[in-house]
Amino acid sequence: MDALVLKKPRGLTKGFFASLSIVLILLGAVGSILESVLLNDDSSPDFLALGAIALLLRALSLASLPIILFLLSEELDRIKNKGRAAALIFILALVAEIPYNLIVGEKIVYTATRSPALAFFLCYIIACLWEREKRLKVPLNIAVALSALWWSAILSIDEGIPCILIFTVCFWLRKKGTLGLFCTSVVLSAVALADPMYTLALPVPALLHFYKE
């Protein structure tokens, strides 16, 4: 009797998506550098072409946000020490501000965040609250999300509101397969209507369909 051969399910691993998001973020950094250079020198004959490239690279970087938020929602159950993870994410978010500020600005510290790193921390905190208080009623869960949106607006966290909206859908529908990705696509479409820079992020839910654990 021939031995049974178990085939591994085909798909794209979290390592692939993590690497893709890093590449997109780096492209966005290049776009920000190019934009900063063009603002200081608008006499270049290729000003319009380079400006369009800078805008395209920044739009591509926004496509990394739904990928990171999706991975965060998927990996949340596997994090054992959530307090330590929260501290690590917060420290990394603060450290990420320094090079970002130097790239797109002239100061090391600004009163408002200039990168979406703190938005990931805020999403992680509300997810921990949802996980810890699983018996919370729907109105209280909504109140947690609304308070996160409020803090995001008060602290002027860059891309904070879109990140919270996208993450909320990813978190609550993370075990729903195609339905979850469809709802994520709907939210992304609404975000893109408000901010056309998110247009290039619209194909991301279709790509996440091939995610495998």
Where are these regions (language model features)?
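Alpha-helical transmembrane segments and their immediate juxtamembrane cytosolic regions
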Residues: 1-213
